[in-house]
């Protein structure tokens, strides 16, 4: 008998059995691989998740640093602006006693005496020109009466009964106050009106 003629007990040639078994193995392999997860695929998935997480952290860090830099830039601009705006504060503080002295000299000057007229005019012009100069740089005088007491620019030193001025308003200014670009350099010392009673 030739090998082709040899049959297995079931009546199949050995090549047919091998082919059938090979097909069965191929048919079984996809099912087995579907159930088994390759550890390399699992590791790749873990690494991809870690990479995504690291990228997100890095992106958040970059955004945080950008925001901090923008805030720092803004704060620096404000600081420089304030420094420019209030650089004169010390200088103006040094000028205030001179302005006060000129004010006091005008208050006590004998304006009725004709011999003092030239001196009084000189003091008035000096004071006016000095106030004009400091106004150019943002200095304002706080000396109004009959205005509401503002604790930001007024320092109340006494309360006096008054019929002419509403209660809580400035009755008299004892010492002028000054502001530089809206910031109080020296509060005005004032007396405040209170209702008669």
Swiss-Prot record:
- One GO BP annotation here? protein folding
Which InterPro entries does this chain map to? Answer: GrpE (IPR000740), GrpE_coiled_coil (IPR013805), GrpE_head (IPR009012)
UniProt keyword annotations, A-Z = Chaperone, Cytoplasm, Stress response
GO terms assigned for molecular function: adenyl-nucleotide exchange factor activity; protein homodimerization activity; protein-folding chaperone binding; unfolded protein binding
One GO cellular-component annotation of the UniProt record comes to: cytosol
Q: What is this protein called?
A: Protein GrpE
Q: Which species expresses this protein natively?
A: Enterobacter sp. (strain 638)
- Localization terms from the record: Cytoplasm
Q: What does this protein do?
A: Participates actively in the response to hyperosmotic and heat shock by preventing the aggregation of stress-denatured proteins, in association with DnaK and GrpE. It is the nucleotide exchange factor for DnaK and may function as a thermosensor. Unfolded proteins bind initially to DnaJ; upon interaction with the DnaJ-bound protein, DnaK hydrolyzes its bound ATP, resulting in the formation of a stable complex. GrpE releases ADP from DnaK; ATP binding to DnaK triggers the release of the substrate protein, thus completing the reaction cycle.
What superkingdom heads the lineage? Bacteria
Instruction: State if Chaperone is listed as a keyword.
Output: yes
Annotated spans, Disordered: 1-41
Question: What family name appears in the similarity comment?
Answer: Belongs to the GrpE family.
* Major location category of this protein: cytoplasm
Q: How does it assemble?
A: Homodimer.
Q: Which residues form a coiled coil?
A: none
């Amino acid at each position: 008998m030739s090998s082709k003629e040899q049959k297995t007990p079931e009546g199949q040639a050995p090549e047919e059995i091998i082919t059938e078994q090979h097909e069965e193995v191929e048919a079984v392999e996809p099912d087995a691989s579907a159930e088994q997860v390759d550890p390399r695929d699992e590791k790749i998935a873990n690494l991809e998740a870690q990479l995504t997480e690291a990228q997100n952290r890095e992106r958040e860090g970059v955004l945080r640093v950008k925001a901090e830099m923008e805030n720092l830039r803004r704060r620096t601009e404000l600081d420089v602006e304030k420094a420019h705006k209030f650089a004169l504060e010390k200088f103006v503080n040094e000028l205030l006693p001179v302005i006060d002295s000129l004010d006091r000299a005008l208050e006590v000057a004998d304006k009725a005496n004709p011999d003092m007229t030239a001196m009084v005019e000189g003091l008035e012009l000096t004071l006016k020109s000095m106030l004009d100069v400091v106004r150019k740089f943002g200095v304002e005088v706080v000396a109004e009466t009959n205005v509401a007491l503002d604790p930001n620019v007024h320092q109340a030193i006494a309360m006096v009964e008054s019929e002419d001025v509403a209660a809580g308003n400035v009755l008299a200014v004892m010492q002028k106050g000054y502001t530089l670009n809206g910031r109080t350099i020296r509060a005005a010392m004032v007396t405040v009106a209170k209702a008669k009673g």
